Design a protein with these regions (language model features):
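Glycine-rich phosphate/cofactor-binding loops in nucleotide/flavin-utilizing enzymes
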Residues: 2, 13-17, 42, 69, ...
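Short secondary-structure junction/hinge motifs that connect adjacent elements
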Residues: 27-49
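Internal helix-loop-helix
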Residues: 49-108, 112-117, 159-163
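A short, Trp-centered hydrophobic/proline-enriched beta-strand micro-motif
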Residues: 117-125
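A structural signal for short hydrophobic beta-strand segments in well-ordered beta-sheet cores
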Residues: 139-142
Length: 168
């Protein structure tokens, strides 16, 4: 088996590594994590401009159609740099779910806005009583005309404070 990266993957890896080395030093990270937002919106916009926010989203949903390898390369560099921007929450978790299971309307409004760096997403899935059992769900959603009424509690919603939209 050949585990070498192709030319495009190597370019992505180099680009993200260079960004972290040049623009994400420890002092910058500390300043961002201590800000009201908890991360840098300017960085989020750079990530969008560089195409990183759409790299793993299918072309049909407005992304670049990359694979898990491209996402892994970005996540690895972000891990090394202790990046605080909500890439995992907005792009990998919520974006991946919308890409695979969202309606065309959700993809065109929510997912494309997230890829453009204009929206932050959060997934509200954990419940206080469930601990690590994701099938222990008490929260209920009931149809009410064209909308739904949700009753229940969610806990530890990563990126909740800065999210524009939630997936429950």
């Amino acid at each position: 088996m050949d585990f070498t990266f192709n030319e495009e993957q190597t370019l992505i890896q180099d680009q993200v590594d260079q960004f972290i080395q040049k623009e994400y030093d420890w002092e910058t990270r500390q300043s961002l994590s201590n800000s009201d937002l908890g991360f840098g919106n300017d960085n989020w916009q750079k990530f969008a401009e560089l195409g990183w926010l759409g790299i793993s989203t299918s072309e049909e949903s407005g992304g670049f159609g990359g694979s898990a390898i491209e996402s892994m390369l970005i996540m690895e560099a972000f891990g090394k740099g202790l990046v605080v921007e909500p890439f995992l929450e907005t792009i990998i978790m919520c974006g991946g779910l919308l890409d695979e299971h969202g309606t065309d309307q959700q993809k065109s409004s929510i997912l494309e806005s997230a890829i453009a760096g204009q929206m932050h997403l959060a997934m509200a899935y954990a419940e206080p009583q469930s601990r690590f059992n994701l099938s222990d769900v008490v929260t209920e959603a009931k149809a009410d005309g064209d909308s739904s009424i949700i009753n229940g509690y969610k806990s530890v919603v990563m990126n909740g404070p800065s999210a524009n939209k939630f997936i429950v």
